[in-house]
From Swiss-Prot:
Role according to the record: Smooth muscle-contracting peptide.
Compartments (UniProt record): Secreted
Subunit organization: Interacts with NTSR1. Interacts with SORT1. Interacts with SORL1.
Similarity remark: Belongs to the neurotensin family.
Highest rank taxon of the organism: Eukaryota
Organism in which the protein naturally occurs: Cavia porcellus
Protein name: Neurotensin
Amino acid sequence: QLYENKSRRPYIL
C-alpha cells in the first residue's frame, strides 16, 4: 500500500 491513513491524513510511505 502506497498510502497509509494516519489521523485522517494521507501521506506517502
